[in-house]
């Protein structure tokens, strides 16, 4: 299957080097990111999930480790907003041009501000969705931040 998606094309246009990883996507999977991490044999803390949120009613994109939970309070603060909530899946699909389970912070149809969980960036390589269910891209965190024109912020709920 082709690895050319709007996300991989955006990375190429940005001049970012990356490698692709494919796995068998299982529809209806509860924790897509954890399933992807297991399928590609990578630590779930390095496999990041892309979550579309609404901050004060406007779209934004939060990218966090697949084994962590997003804090709505922290994501609102990261974007200088008063409130945040998860975006309904159908709205996220219309806005990004990607299907749920395949949403990437790169190459979205309608660009939204992006923030990455800062604690996930202290590794040589992170893995994110490549714009299609079952397709991941692996690249250095600094390149991912630059390509997504993203900020690094504290976005996750406390563990424990």
Predicted regions and their residues:
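Extended, low-hydrophobicity, polar/charged segments
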Residues: 1-160
